[in-house]
Design a protein with these regions (language model features):
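Membrane-interfacial helix termini and adjacent extracytoplasmic/periplasmic loops
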Residues: 6, 10-13, 20, 77-109, ...
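Transmembrane alpha-helices
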Residues: 118-119, 141-173
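C-terminal transmembrane helix and the adjacent membrane-cytosol boundary/short C-terminal tail
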Residues: 114-131, 135-138, 142, 146-147, ...
């Protein structure tokens, strides 16, 4: 117990003092995950929104494959990226292996199915509510996907935040393709694994506390996004009611029983 207490105290001192090595690892981890999420979300939002409204032969098979990718272990993604970027692989000429770019690619491939699947579900649910009205106005699938995605932007904001949490907490893929090189490809999760095996518990615990803080912050942002969405929908409903009253249209009528 004393060892744990001492390690926790030292970890808090490292955080409070702004240890250069710790901050470098945290900054690199945030940069990798943010870049990967930006790339994955740019493609995943568009693809998921289209899948939410499109109807084509083989759609069920595509959705089954997409759902399968949700359960792919991160180490398998790391292995695939490693094989692609190795010298004998098809992308070996890029020279990305054991680099920042390799970790971004691995995390982007890991997050892409999550963003696509969640976006598809959100847009498909919205399509079930508003799709018939949009179709009656002549909106084609591409336009409907954009309109519905914009209408569900608060829900999709939650998807983006959740995808960042998935990326920053990943360890297997970045360990394989990044190599955990000190000062170059060492991020929070790989550093925690390494420092724990070396017995440097204060640094590992300090990074763990920061990682927990990041995850907690993401959960708070998700809760705020949901509340923001509920408040926005409530305000829009109130303004619609006021417009109906202004036109002389009763918003709600109650008939008395005879």
């Amino acid at each position: 117990m004393t060892s744990i207490t001492d390690s926790a105290a030292t970890a808090l001192q490292l955080i409070a003092s702004g240890d250069a090595g710790l901050l470098a690892i945290v900054g690199r981890s945030m940069a990798v995950s943010a870049t990967a999420c930006a790339l994955a979300c740019g493609l995943g939002l568009a693809l998921g929104a289209w899948l939410g409204v499109a109807r084509f032969t083989g759609r069920a098979a595509v959705l089954s494959l997409l759902n399968t990718f949700l359960a792919v272990p991160s180490v398998v993604v790391g292995l695939v990226v490693y094989l692609l970027l190795s010298r004998s692989g098809p992308l070996g000429f890029l020279g990305w292996l054991f680099s920042f770019k390799a970790m971004v690619l691995a995390q982007a491939l890991l997050v892409l199915p999550v963003v696509t699947a969640l976006t598809r579900q959100v847009v498909e649910d919205a399509e079930g509510i508003h799709g018939e009205q949009l179709r009656s106005l002549g909106a084609r699938p591409g336009l409907r996907s954009l309109l519905l995605a914009w209408d569900e932007r608060y829900a999709l904001l939650t998807v983006l935040i959740a995808s960042f949490g998935r990326a920053i907490s990943e360890v297997g893929a970045v360990m394989i393709v990044g190599g955990n090189i000190d000062g170059f490809t060492r991020v929070m999760t790989t550093a925690i694994a390494l420092e724990t095996s070396k017995g440097d518990l204060p640094l590992a615990l300090g990074l763990g506390l920061i990682l927990l803080g990041v995850v907690l912050l993401l959960n708070v942002l998700i809760a705020l996004a949901r509340r923001w969405r509920e408040r926005s929908e409530s305000n829009e409903g109130g303004r619609e009611g006021e417009r109906e009253e202004g036109r002389g249209v009763p918003v709600r009528t109650v008939e008395a029983a005879p």
